[in-house]
Swiss-Prot record:
PANTHER family: TRANSLATION FACTOR (PTHR23115). Residues 86-90 are annotated as: G2. GO terms for biological process: hydrogen sulfide biosynthetic process; sulfate assimilation. The keyword Magnesium does not apply. It comes from Buchnera aphidicola subsp. Acyrthosiphon pisum (strain 5A). Residues 162-165 are annotated as: G4. Residues 19-238 form the tr-type G domain. Residues 200-202 are annotated as: G5. The keyword Transcription does not apply. It catalyses: sulfate + ATP + H(+) = adenosine 5'-phosphosulfate + diphosphate. This is Sulfate adenylyltransferase subunit 1. Residues 107-110 are annotated as: G3.
Amino acid sequence: MNINMKDNFKKWLDLQQKKTLLKFLTCGSVDDGKSTLIGRLLHDTKQIYDDQLFFLKSDSKRHGTQGNEIDLALVVDGLQSEREQGITIDVAYRYFSTNKRKFIIADTPGHEQYTRNMATGASTCDLSILLVDARKGLSEQTYRHSFISTLLGIKYLIVAINKMDLVNYKQEIFENIKKDFLIFSKKLANDLNIIFIPMSALLGENIVFKTKLMPWYQGVTLLSFLETIKIKNSISSEELRFPVQYINRPNADFRGYSGILLSGRMHVGQTIKILPENINSRVSRIVTFDKELKKAEIGESITVVLKDEIDINRGDFFVNIDSILQPSQEAIIDIVWMTDNILLAGESYNVKLSGKKIRVYIKEILFKLDVNTLKKVKSHSLVLNSIGRVKIYFSKPVIFDNYSENRMTGNMIFIDLLTNITVGAGMIVNSLDKKGKIPSNKQKDFESDFYDLITRHFPHWNIPKILMKKVYK
């Protein structure tokens, strides 16, 4: 490799590193064209290689629905059952980039029975593309996916009114769907950013290239919008949140605390507070795998060395010295239930919250949400794919934020005690004891430890519901 090639390669790497990343998902009713849209994006941005095109043409003849044409939906419908049925079942992730930005796409399922898959895809995305069939207008699944997207903290919605070619590109149909969605959106979060784009994913109109068949539409193409939109981070850049994930002690002369800086900034010499111990200390060093830093920014993986010798554990938080954040032991959360086993009040689970594993107890199911009508329904249980609001009790005081304020420190996953399978995803609505005044109860602590022992070594006794309802009712 000559010097010019090395220089060009270095410039290319520098350019790639400077590109911002946008994570978005596509969702909507079955057969609205989600997979076709992603296939069109990849095809028209030259992201499909010649050998992939060759196999795609072959697969299109066997599984495709477009006659002799390439079925672009097969680019992302990877499972055999998906290709045979013509639907998306699993969340399919695809990566591509343009000269302006890098993208991660999540193609989520449209069927109601795959709500948990859709929630999984939405949990890490910044933007949601809601596909609407121009012939059918808004559907119950459109309402459901809009709500789930906003429930998972997504503030940017693109309503992609697809298959405009099948309604003769009529502006009236586009405007009516737009009007209906704006009326519905009043039931969602107040701070949403919504844009409407008429398109045809099959023909590639208003996806990457502007069409001349809809002169009444003066907006940009889908790709142009994705390349230029600026996502406002809901996480405050001032509120320091550094959960300790690992105690780094390679030898007797070094003790550091490793983790990811989730929000705020940190610099050498900064005075911080450690929660839940509520102890102050000063940052003496910030170390990475290959160098030392004077300061650290959001998203950096670092090891922090403190001036004082303090007993710090995994899951403890470093926050600003003037932070009002306090440990809490009770909270109200929204939950997406992801297993066939029914969720009932009085049951207990492990949860992972900001890297810390802790026991929680379901004190009360406040209501179940009908995601098609957004009505609150009184319920004593949650079944697979249900979304509800519950009151939980942590076995120990923990640190967290409301999910609406910080997605990183306000989310948790529920883990079954016996199988260690993930059974639910929770988003914290608020704390019920902001001041951290946790009542001490040694009897409950003993019974909780005794319960741990029994469920670990004698699972066949089948006692979780009986014991924990008595202890934490």
